[in-house]
């Protein structure tokens, strides 16, 4: 079972966000989904999942793959930290992280707590098990074709 971030406690909530978040104190431009972001001063690299311009929140993933979550020069895993400028690779949007710790109210009265402008994912990466995975060859479809999809979930 997946666990809460930084603990060995099994997660019980029905929904969880598996992204890192940074709160902007200032920003310019609009970050694009799936674009590479970098923080030159730390060497951190990530990929944008969502840009919430209303709340100035940048949701991103940072995996441990070359040129995605690791420093392209050293190969080390570098985290985004401090009020160091974050830049979008394709949009050239920029963001200066907040240094405040605060609780932000999201949609449906959910909250997000940041520490010095950053929030961790709600689940511990690599916790839990992949129960079933099936890789299939691509299927050619016609534009007027209909499909029946069946999903079986057991608990």
Where are these regions (language model features)?
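Interface-prone segments of viral and bacterial extracellular assemblies
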Residues: 1-155
């Amino acid at each position: 079972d997946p666990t809460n971030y930084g603990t060995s406690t099994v997660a019980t909530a029905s929904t969880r966000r598996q992204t890192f978040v940074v709160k902007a104190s200032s920003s310019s431009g609009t970050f694009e989904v799936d674009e590479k972001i970098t923080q030159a001063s730390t060497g951190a690299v990530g990929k944008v999942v969502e840009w919430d311009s209303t709340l100035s929140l940048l949701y991103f993933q940072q995996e441990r793959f070359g040129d995605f979550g690791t420093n392209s020069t050293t190969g080390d895993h570098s985290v985004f930290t401090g009020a160091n400028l974050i830049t979008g690779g394709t949009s050239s949007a920029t963001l200066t992280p907040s240094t405040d710790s605060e609780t932000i109210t999201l949609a449906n009265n959910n909250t997000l707590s940041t520490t010095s402008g950053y929030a961790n994912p709600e689940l511990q990466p690599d916790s839990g098990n992949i129960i079933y995975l099936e890789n299939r060859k691509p299927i050619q479809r016609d534009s007027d074709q209909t499909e029946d999809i069946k999903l079986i979930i057991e608990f």
